[in-house]
Design a protein with these regions (language model features):
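Central regulatory/effector-binding core of bacterial HTH transcription factors
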Residues: 1-49, 117
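Secondary-structure junction motif
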Residues: 2, 44, 72-79, 85-107, ...
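Beta-alpha-beta core module
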Residues: 49-60, 121-169
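Flexible hinge/capping segments at coil-to-helix
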Residues: 49-87
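A late-sequence structural motif
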Residues: 1-2, 6, 68-74, 79, ...
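Short hydrophobic/charged patches on amphipathic alpha-helices used for structural packing
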Residues: 30, 34, 54, 79, ...
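Short loop/turn segments at beta->alpha junctions
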Residues: 25, 78, 118-119, 137
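Alpha-to-beta junction loops
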Residues: 33-42, 62, 109, 127-134, ...
Length: 169
C-alpha cells in the first residue's frame, strides 16, 4: 500500500540504490539501522529509543475477506459465522498476539486457524479457492478483494484503529 508511492519518490534517487524488503519487526533491525545497512522500517509499533525516529504515516482497521460464492458467509459477517470458519493467517513476526486474537481472547473466544502463511499475498489466493477467510489491513483487503474477486466484510469485533509507523535512525 505504501510501497508504490514510496517507489515513485525513489525515481529521483541515484540508480545504484537498491530496495530490499524484509519482514522483520523494526525492533529486530535496530542494529542494522544504526549501522546504516537498513535505512527505513515500517511497523505497527513505534521504536521509542534514543537515536531512532518513528512517524505515524497512516492508521488502519481490519477487514475480512471471503470468496464471493462462499456457502456460509452472508453480506454481513456475524461473530458466530466468523468463529465457525477456518482462517488463513499471516505468520507472526514477533511473539505478540495479533490484535484480532487478543480481542477474541478477552471474550473467552478463539478462531479456528487452519493455515499460516509467510506473506500477505498468499492469504487471498487461498481464500479464493477455499471456504477459508482471512483478515487483513483495510487498504490491502480492498486491493486484494478487487484483484482476486473476493468479498470484504467488517470484522464482527471491536478492534481499535492501529497506526503504521515509518522508523529510521
Amino acid at each position: 500500500i505504501i510501497l508504490p508511492r514510496f517507489l515513485d519518490g525513489l525515481a529521483k534517487v541515484p540508480p545504484r540504490k537498491r530496495i530490499r524488503i524484509r519482514r522483520e519487526a523494526a525492533a529486530l533491525l535496530k542494529g542494522e539501522m544504526r549501522d546504516g545497512a537498513v535505512d527505513l522500517a515500517l511497523d505497527y509499533f513505534a521504536l521509542q529509543e534514543p537515536g531512532y525516529h518513528s512517524e505515524c504515516v497512516m492508521t488502519e482497521t481490519l477487514l475480512s475477506l471471503s470468496r464471493r460464492d462462499h456457502p456460509t458467509v452472508a453480506e454481513r459477517l456475524s461473530l458466530e459465522t466468523f468463529l465457525s470458519l477456518r482462517h488463513v493467517v499471516l505468520a507472526p513476526r514477533t511473539s505478540t498476539m495479533p490484535m484480532i486474537d487478543l480481542a477474541l481472547s478477552k471474550r473467552g473466544l478463539q478462531r479456528h486457524i487452519s493455515v499460516t502463511v509467510p506473506h500477505f499475498l498468499s492469504m487471498p489466493m487461498m481464500v479464493q479457492t477455499s471456504d477459508m477467510i482471512c483478515t487483513l489491513p483495510r487498504r490491502m483487503a480492498h486491493l486484494y478483494a478487487d484483484h482476486f474477486h473476493l468479498k470484504s466484510h467488517t470484522v464482527p469485533l471491536r478492534i481499535p484503529r492501529f497506526p503504521v509507523y515509518v522508523i529510521w535512525h
